[in-house]
């Protein structure tokens, strides 16, 4: 496929720019995806208003097409593909690792320390464009039951949380506390339940998020943070606290409560 497309870049200074790019051609082990949905992450908001604060492996390469939560349909195949083909609906995992190091081979591409590691939307072109070039190894098949928007929302937030919960081995033996019920915190509760947690507890400042966690059945108990919150949790767990705690609040008080 040849031609031009418009893509969004994030130069900071409360600005998003649209620039013209060539539609990329997939090479070995690559596919061209027509973007059907590409959601916005908190890191995108930060980059728009305060520029990307990451350095080194997390640094933003100026002029890179933004969007690390893309989902779409494969419209063109490169060579030597093993699992995917034209017409497949796919989610793009937001980190493209080397595929060879220990972390990559364990499925933890986000922890890849190779110089080849690149995040879509930060160091390589992402999904805020009509088409995105992706490595086949970075793709996850999107089930028919899920929409493209579902897939885009899963790409980063759920993927990051899933790795964390897998590493701490959440199971039916565990009561799980999640502090901070934004999108990532809510995803944490949902995945913890799916992994068998016998009790899920959420702590959140905003009332609407507390209500959402309860109405969706994600948390067995939800509390607002105050001087009594720790005692409430101890009372629920027979005085010994929870087996696993995840802080999604980015707040010192939240981290302290989780610990």
Where are these regions (language model features)?
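N-terminal glycine-rich cofactor-binding segment
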Residues: 7-25, 42-76, 91-92, 111-125
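Glycine-rich beta-strand-centered segment in the early N-terminal region that forms part
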Residues: 22-38, 53-102, 138, 143-145
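NAD(P)H dinucleotide-binding glycine-rich loop of Rossmann-like/cofactor-binding domains
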Residues: 57-61, 68, 98-179
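Short, well-ordered coil/turn residues at beta-beta hairpins
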Residues: 93, 246-248
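Mid-domain Rossmann-like dinucleotide-binding core that forms the NAD(H)/NADP(H) cofactor-binding site
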Residues: 144-227, 231
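Conserved amphipathic alpha-helix within the SDR
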Residues: 229-239
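Rossmann-fold NAD(P) dinucleotide-binding segment
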Residues: 252-259
